[in-house]
Amino acid sequence: MDVNPTLLFLKVPAQNAISTTFPYTGDPPYSHGTGTGYTMDTVNRTHQYSERGKWTINTETGAPQLNPIDGPLPEDNEPTGYAQTDCVLEAMAFLEKSHPGIFENSCLETMEVIQQTRVDKLTQGRQTFDWTLNRNQPAATALANTIEVFRLNGLTTSESGRLIDFLKDVMESMDKEEMEIVTHFQRKRRVRDNMTKKMVTQRTIGKKKQKLNKRGYLIRALTLNTMTKDAERGKLKRRAIATPGMQIRGFVYFVETLARSICEKLEQSGLPVGGNEKKAKLANVVRKMMTNSQDTELSFTITGDNTKWNENQNPRMFLAMITYITRNQPEWFRNVLSVAPIMFSNKMARLGKGYMFESKNMKLRTQIPAEMLSGIDLRYFNDSTRKKIEKIRPLLIEGAASLSPGMMMGMFNMLSTVLGVSILNLGQKEYTKTAYWWDGLQSSDDFALIVNAPNHEGIQAGVDRFYRTCKLLGINMSKKKSYINRTGTFEFTSFFYRYGFVANFSMELPSFGVSGINESADMSIGVTVIKNNMINNDLGPATAQMALQLFIKDYRYTYRCHRGDTQIQTRRSFEIKKLWDQTRSKAGLLVSDGGPNLYNIRNLHIPEVCLKWELMDKDYQGRLCNPLNPFVSHKEIESVNNAVVMPSHGPAKTMEYDAVATTHSWVPKRNRSILNTSQRGILEDEQMYQKCCNLFEKFFPSSSYRRPVGISSMVEAMVSRARIDARIDFESGRIKKEDFAEIMKICSTIEDLRRQK
């Protein structure tokens, strides 16, 4: 029977069919090659938006810098970055007037956080620009290298383990006349491979010391590396994102802590909450506007879009905001928080890998690194690239472009939200002093604006006033891309509202399926995703049951573990059939061992091992979960593990799932190729840091009570904690006298070893 697809939607309101229009099936687009062009676009655009600002030269680095603050007032609708300081400060003052004590309280909370945050906070995060090697590294390695180089230069305050002390070292490093760094260099040599007896090129990385003068060091400390943002759906062009180095990261973290604390207290802020909590917050604002717009008033909502939010924001404006927010606070606190915006107003954007050239007959390929772009003959480039390079040349210093205005993606999401909310706050009747008033929602650069007025003229006047207020603060609402509707239908951060939020199920599509971690985790994640979508995203029972069957099928094909009584032949079927035949209780076999699927939509919350435990043969239980079985994963498995799932918008989010250690929770080994290179040392460092941090976490689980604060080293802290815990356990009868004595002996041994060292 042919189905006319339009019939499917006859009974469905258009908004509920929104899912079908989203570009979320199939693989997302990835970028290939270098991000140099995209970065140049960003730098050039940012300068263009602020072109009528004042040019100055940075006395330390010699970089030309453009300052658009308090620039000309706009004469047309083109996007500009000319924020007016007095307007921003006034918006902050009104925000404080509407929320008495908000800044004061947030400052106190932040001071407490600053006292307690440890350096290992900076090991969280993916790629980080490592200024010692001039390339990206995992966060833990980049931090380790930075601390190692600081120590080499006599900066050792950070050894206390507190983040604030590490930041003191950073400040001090910027005053030094020269910094000695340890950097890597590559040597290639031909050697004979033992296994294959062929000649291979072996690359070794040596470490060498190098001196940087003050200018060279400052340039590196202020550099943000750039990459192309991958996997962005629904866009034709790629765009560049930035990774800051370790010097900037800690300062940004504290500013964002303060801003987060403020956002939590603002009802119009879509950050830092997410999911259902966010929906509830939004629904409240809408409800308020609809109840107040009785029969006498009209209420309209704008689904807003801002033009190039990041490129028109300005770090100098953020400095003004912070100066105001912290105005009655201690000097040290104000200083710590003002460093991040100051560093950002002097930032340099690294242009990435440069350009790849190929000769016509494809015989020759050559890479033109970014450092060469300032001097190379431009006749080799096509027109558009030539224009980009010509424009950016005056800004180039050692392969990085001076970029004073603009914020780069994702650096101050919370603080820029505070700025946006301060405009929404000005819409109250007592401030507009006319018949119209507004309110709305702000989440980073995304906003929804609800305007109420007695008639259409009033609505128009309200929107115009909002638009102009935004302009004064360096925010450019796009008239082309924003649209207005009667209140009750709008979109905000990909949530679609129609008298309540409509589930946008397509968003979750990418996270369905087999994750590819291991058999145990994949089963657990798969059913958890289905469970979560039944709770949060209107996934109905019938569809969920179907999703479950599809998932099990997908899982069996991925791991070649079809049921023991199936006819399908795979590499594993021989072993699986053998197991099937010798198992008495076949229902007890895990799906990954060829067993039947016992999941249905009622028991998705139970880990498979627990679900089938009572049904298993005794010897199968013994093999599956025996800690002495060498195939049972010994990676300390927490009772709850975190998986990274890819929702369609926003960063990859972590999702908790239950983990039971069995023979199926294996951890794949690292690729051999890295172990044969000189990177091996880096890898070992990284694993060591990982182990130390994990060990420390074990001693001080964040849930128990506050992390140790003070000057003791990590080892001392762990030893003293071990002693306290042992005594408590001994006195409460949880451990025997011999165990207690042994723990005390081990602690003393550790202390002796430390003294000898």
UniProtKB/Swiss-Prot annotation:
Question: What Pfam families does the entry give?
Answer: Flu_PB1
**In which residues does the motif Nuclear localization signal occur?**
187-195, 203-216
- Residues covered by region (Promoter-binding site): 249-256
Reactions catalysed, semicolon-separated, are: RNA(n) + a ribonucleoside 5'-triphosphate = RNA(n+1) + diphosphate
Q: Known EC number(s)?
A: 2.7.7.48
How this protein is processed and modified after translation, per its record? Phosphorylated by host PRKCA.
Q: What is this protein called?
A: RNA-directed RNA polymerase catalytic subunit
The species this protein was found in: Influenza A virus (strain A/Swine/Ontario/2/1981 H1N1)
State how it assembles.
Influenza RNA polymerase is composed of three subunits: PB1, PB2 and PA. Interacts (via N-terminus) with PA (via C-terminus). Interacts (via C-terminus) with PB2 (via N-terminus); this interaction is essential for transcription initiation. Interacts (via C-terminus) with human PKP2 (via N-terminus); the interaction competitively inhibits the interaction between the RNA polymerase subunits PB1 and PB2.
Q: Does the keyword Glycosyltransferase apply?
A: no
> The RdRp catalytic domain covers which part of the protein?
286-483
Q: Name one GO biological process term.
A: viral transcription
Q: What is its main location?
A: host cell
Q: Which UniProt keywords apply?
A: Eukaryotic host gene expression shutoff by virus, Eukaryotic host transcription shutoff by virus, Host cytoplasm, Host gene expression shutoff by virus, Host nucleus, Host-virus interaction, Inhibition of host RNA polymerase II by virus, Nucleotide-binding, Nucleotidyltransferase, Phosphoprotein, RNA-directed RNA polymerase, Transferase, Viral RNA replication, Viral transcription
**Role of this protein:** RNA-dependent RNA polymerase which is responsible for replication and transcription of virus RNA segments. The transcription of viral mRNAs occurs by a unique mechanism called cap-snatching. 5' methylated caps of cellular mRNAs are cleaved after 10-13 nucleotides by PA. In turn, these short capped RNAs are used as primers by PB1 for transcription of viral mRNAs. During virus replication, PB1 initiates RNA synthesis and copy vRNA into complementary RNA (cRNA) which in turn serves as a template for the production of more vRNAs.
**Molecular function (GO) terms listed?**
nucleotide binding; RNA binding; RNA-directed RNA polymerase activity
The record's subcellular locations are: Host nucleus; Host cytoplasm
Q: Which family does it belong to?
A: Belongs to the influenza viruses polymerase PB1 family.
Listed under GO cellular component are: host cell cytoplasm; host cell nucleus
The broad enzyme category this protein falls into is transferase
Q: Which HAMAP family match?
A: INFV_RDRP
